[in-house]
């Protein structure tokens, strides 16, 4: 019998749009009990961004130096309204009564992440007041800034959720999220959890594919599979000093953007498919290098995020990680498409339960902190 069969607990709704800005993931979650250590996905949906707004978000995320305050204020409002619309669509499609949902956890859209600036800052837009207003549901948002205020990176935040859901294993595990940026959670049988960003993943692959193949992403890795890895370019990309930094570390599109990759090519005239293959290999290499260096005893790598649907990328990861099983998080009951949205529902639930949800060993914060700000219905 499922542990959820007779559970009549409140639902939580998570909203997430990542570095790739390919859509808003919305997930309705139910927890087995008040510990929030078991959860099920009740319903999920992904709502594509309106093309012009997505173009604006990608440009903002890539580090445009000057943005008019009026324009930014309008984008913040537009993103909030889009998040509210995604939540309302999921509620309508699921048939769940609005009163059953205790809170929405909204990540927002990151437009700048500067954890190493002085003073450090991170900025996610998507007006949470509008989400609360247009859904009629209490909304929790702004999860990252308290960790940054406490001296942390503000990212990644998902390792705490991964630990809660997957931390009872009898083997050394890793959870790999392949979103716009890759990030790893290392969960040893004994010892402290470690989590960090690994570098670019879908963000670069999508951008290059859009520019040279005319499609927003490389379906099943076919474009990359048609090319060959350029060893010189791969080494030039991996020579970026960021890859050698020890955890805690985090990054974003403002650092690993298409111009960064083009600059590494120099004057070389490379076939577009070969560049795509090399960018895919960069993702596999940066993940594998970090995993083999920091937890070589890993037996199982559970993959989530958009990259789980790229069999070429998964095959390259498996080839670089001999002796490790590389598989989808779905095997453990966690839908890879909605795992991050589920995580932000969990973060909202943890704040309302009065529990700290950052892992100082992961982010570098001075200590445990309550994450998020509450916007009442």
From Swiss-Prot:
InterPro entries: Anhydro_N_Ac-Mur_kinase, ATPase_NBD. It comes from the Bacteria. Keywords: ATP-binding, Carbohydrate metabolism, Kinase, Nucleotide-binding, Transferase. Pathway: Amino-sugar metabolism; 1,6-anhydro-N-acetylmuramate degradation; Cell wall biogenesis; peptidoglycan recycling. Gene3D superfamilies: 3.30.420.40. ATP binds at residues 18-25. Its EC number is 2.7.1.170. It catalyses: 1,6-anhydro-N-acetyl-beta-muramate + ATP + H2O = N-acetyl-D-muramate 6-phosphate + ADP + H(+). GO terms for biological process: 1,6-anhydro-N-acetyl-beta-muramic acid catabolic process; amino sugar metabolic process; peptidoglycan turnover. GO terms for molecular function: ATP binding; kinase activity; phosphotransferase activity, alcohol group as acceptor. Catalyzes the specific phosphorylation of 1,6-anhydro-N-acetylmuramic acid (anhMurNAc) with the simultaneous cleavage of the 1,6-anhydro ring, generating MurNAc-6-P. Is required for the utilization of anhMurNAc either imported from the medium or derived from its own cell wall murein, and thus plays a role in cell wall recycling. Belongs to the anhydro-N-acetylmuramic acid kinase family. HAMAP family: AnhMurNAc_kinase. This is Anhydro-N-acetylmuramic acid kinase. It comes from Xanthomonas euvesicatoria pv. vesicatoria (strain 85-10).
